[in-house]
Amino acid sequence: MSKGIVLLAAGGTGGHVFPAEALAFKLKERGYSVHLVTDSRAERYAGKFPAEEIHVVPSATIGSKNPVAVARSLWTLWSGMRAAKKLIQRLKPVIVVGFGGYPTVPPLLAATRLGVPTMIHEQNAVMGRANKALATRVQGIAGGFLPEGGGAFPEKTVTTGNPVRPAIIAAAEVPYTPSHPGEAFNLVVFGGSQGAQYFSKALPTAISLLDDALRLRLRITQQVRPEDMEMVGGCVAKLEMGADIAPFFTDMAERLAKAHLVICRSGASTVSEISVIGRPAVLVPYPHALDHDQAANAAALAATGGAKVIAQSELSPEKIAAILTAVMNDPEKLSHMAAAAKLAGKPDAANLLADMVEAIAAGRTIAELKRTRA
């Protein structure tokens, strides 16, 4: 018999959906039924989500100064609130947990108005706009990189780390094996769940600048946006090298486990996953992030020695080629970085977050939860 329904709310990108998925698996192990509320974008990432049902609720962000656009967004939010209220009244969840992104706002607001226990999980080192809007209303705030007892809501905040999917936990069992001169070198390049156009343009040029001996060693996995597939595929064909390119890899965990180096953005889920697996990385924060959250996430891992951070404005093809030349000839350095990254990982984050969910659902306070963890 189920202990009750937990309703998870997540924005429709991998950065929000993946940690929610990891928690969902853990809650199901503990005897709960899990439902997910999100937007239509999440269908791409929710294929393995262990939910009894996935609900799409209307939502919108108010980012325009156009009065017509603002009015349309407010109408959509109001519609989402009504739909979320009906959903919560029907499901009667024991708790509603938000993972950030504007689609979480209607269900979390509806839950607080109905008196249902609520909490949010903030993946980044800087709190996002949706979570900021909800933080004063919820009973607890779990943080991936937020400092425990710090920030604007110290009495509510518990540092759990970012939960990672079972596939990542399995990949973490694979030890890092360095690639020595003359051996194949697995390079994984991606820009988060939605890709990064900059890498699609810069990497092929960088590879063309490498010595033939190094280029022949490379085995590349690169996530490429659909509109860039033809361009990148043509460059790869000209270079006559081994490369897998695709808009999305369902087996990314296994590919990361085989990687000798990762070049990627520094979204919270990405940084958490590569640290749990323990792989050296060159992190390139997304330069247009509103709160510079990716720069803060990257700095946290770089401080441990597990990653090198380079601003996109400084990452020319020549710079990439120089980095690859250096590290492909220095397997010992990459091994040290891999070990440092793994030490920074929090593989038990899903369990810690599930403990917090159960505590709040049972009516316990954050202060009580912290005392039991001490």
Curated annotation (Swiss-Prot):
**Does Cytoplasm appear among the keywords?**
no
Pfam families associated with the record: Glyco_tran_28_C, Glyco_transf_28
Primary location class? membrane
Q: How does it sit in the membrane?
A: Peripheral membrane protein
Q: Where in the cell is it found?
A: Cell inner membrane
Q: What family does the entry list?
A: Belongs to the glycosyltransferase 28 family. MurG subfamily.
Provide the GO MF annotations for this entry. Answer: UDP-N-acetyl-D-glucosamine:N-acetylmuramoyl-L-alanyl-D-glutamyl-meso-2,6-diaminopimelyl-D-alanyl-D-alanine-diphosphoundecaprenol 4-beta-N-acetylglucosaminlytransferase activity; undecaprenyldiphospho-muramoylpentapeptide beta-N-acetylglucosaminyltransferase activity
State the PANTHER family in the record: GLYCOSYLTRANSFERASE, UDP-N-ACETYLGLUCOSAMINE--N-ACETYLMURAMYL-(PENTAPEPTIDE) PYROPHOSPHORYL-UNDECAPRENOL N-ACETYLGLUCOSAMINE TRANSFERASE 1
So which domain of life are we looking at? Answer: Bacteria
Q: What is this protein called?
A: UDP-N-acetylglucosamine--N-acetylmuramyl-(pentapeptide) pyrophosphoryl-undecaprenol N-acetylglucosamine transferase
Gene Ontology BP annotations: carbohydrate metabolic process; cell division; cell wall organization; lipid glycosylation; peptidoglycan biosynthetic process; regulation of cell shape
Query: Which residues hold UDP-N-acetyl-alpha-D-glucosamine?
Result: 13-15, 124, 165, 193, 294
General function of this protein: Cell wall formation. Catalyzes the transfer of a GlcNAc subunit on undecaprenyl-pyrophosphoryl-MurNAc-pentapeptide (lipid intermediate I) to form undecaprenyl-pyrophosphoryl-MurNAc-(pentapeptide)GlcNAc (lipid intermediate II).
Q: Which Gene3D superfamilies match?
A: Glycogen Phosphorylase B (3.40.50.2000)
Q: What HAMAP family does the entry give?
A: MurG
The UniProt catalytic activity note for this protein reads: di-trans,octa-cis-undecaprenyl diphospho-N-acetyl-alpha-D-muramoyl-L-alanyl-D-glutamyl-meso-2,6-diaminopimeloyl-D-alanyl-D-alanine + UDP-N-acetyl-alpha-D-glucosamine = di-trans,octa-cis-undecaprenyl diphospho-[N-acetyl-alpha-D-glucosaminyl-(1->4)]-N-acetyl-alpha-D-muramoyl-L-alanyl-D-glutamyl-meso-2,6-diaminopimeloyl-D-alanyl-D-alanine + UDP + H(+)
| Native source species | Rhizobium leguminosarum bv. trifolii (strain WSM2304)
Pathway membership: Cell wall biogenesis; peptidoglycan biosynthesis
Q: Does the keyword Lipid metabolism apply?
A: no
Arranged from A to Z, the UniProt key words for this protein are: Cell cycle, Cell division, Cell inner membrane, Cell membrane, Cell shape, Cell wall biogenesis/degradation, Glycosyltransferase, Membrane, Peptidoglycan synthesis, Transferase
EC nos: 2.4.1.227
Q: Which GO terms describe its cellular component?
A: plasma membrane
